[in-house]
Structure formats: structure tokens, C-alpha cells
């Protein structure tokens, strides 16, 4: 059972961010789970080789909170750094999630439950999105 503190933190992390996503169609990457949760990533590479990430997600509170935490954690970082972090989480190469980042500590509850898929969908989606990313003809400063 989740504590009230955990519930409040999940609700805070899951606040809906509205983004208007307007880029070339090959820069939008949508993933959907069996239960109907969906996430769409927009990836833009800046001139310094770092990536600006935006996402639009619809689904359960665990997915929304996980997506927001991941976006804050990976925004404005290099591709290799993002892929390394995401791969660690997907492969469970940690004793506790707070080893990776303190902001992920709240998700330790879900790593061995049936909600693990909800937690991992943004990570798998971002990994697939970055691996299939094709740079635009121009980059943004």
C-alpha cells in the first residue's frame, strides 16, 4: 500500500504539461502499452550536441510521473549520457533507483510490481526514440 506522502509525491510529479509539438514528422516518436498508456516524445538536437526533450503522455499516474521525472532528468544532455541512464533503468543495473538520481527514489515501490511496465514505458520509449532519431537539416541554437 502506498503512503500518503508517496501518493502526494506521485500526484505532484504527474502534473500535466501541455506542449505544442510542431516539428518534422520524423521527429515525433509515439509508443503505446497494452493497457492504453501512451507517450509521444519530441526530440530536438541543439548545436552543442545536447538534446531538448518534450513529451506528451496520457495514461495512469505512474506513467505521467515517470515521464515527467525522466524528462527533467534527461533534458539538455548528450545522447550517450541519456542512453546510458535509460539503459541502466531498463536493465535494472541498480540496487535502488536513488543510486541513479534522488528524484527517482519514489519509484522504487514500482520496480517489482505489475506497475513496472507503466514506470518503464517512458524509458523504453525514449531509448527507441533516440536510437531511431535522425537529425534535422538544421539544428537549433
Swiss-Prot record:
> Coiled-coil segments, which residues?
none
Superkingdom of this protein's organism:
Bacteria
Query: Which GO BP terms apply?
Result: iron-sulfur cluster assembly
The entry lists its GO molecular-function terms as: iron ion binding; iron-sulfur cluster binding
Q: Which InterPro entries match?
A: NIF_FeS_clus_asmbl_NifU_N
Q: Which SUPFAM superfamilies match?
A: SufE/NifU
Protein name in UniProt: Uncharacterized protein BB_0085
Q: What is the lineage of its organism?
A: Bacteria, Pseudomonadati, Spirochaetota, Spirochaetia, Spirochaetales
Amino acid at each position: 500500500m502506498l503512503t500518503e506522502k508517496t501518493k502526494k509525491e506521485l500526484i505532484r510529479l504527474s502534473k500535466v504539461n501541455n506542449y505544442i509539438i510542431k516539428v518534422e514528422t520524423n521527429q515525433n516518436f509515439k509508443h503505446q502499452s497494452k493497457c492504453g498508456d501512451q507517450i509521444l516524445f519530441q526530440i530536438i538536437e541543439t548545436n552543442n550536441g545536447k538534446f531538448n526533450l518534450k513529451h506528451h503522455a496520457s495514461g495512469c499516474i505512474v506513467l505521467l510521473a515517470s515521464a515527467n521525472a525522466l524528462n527533467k532528468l534527461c533534458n539538455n544532455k548528450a545522447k550517450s549520457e541519456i542512453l546510458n541512464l535509460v539503459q541502466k533503468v531498463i536493465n535494472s543495473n541498480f540496487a535502488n533507483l536513488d543510486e541513479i538520481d534522488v528524484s527517482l527514489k519514489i519509484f522504487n515501490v514500482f520496480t517489482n510490481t505489475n506497475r513496472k511496465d507503466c514506470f518503464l514505458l517512458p524509458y523504453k520509449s525514449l531509448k527507441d526514440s533516440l536510437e531511431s532519431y535522425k537529425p534535422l537539416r538544421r539544428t537549433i541554437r
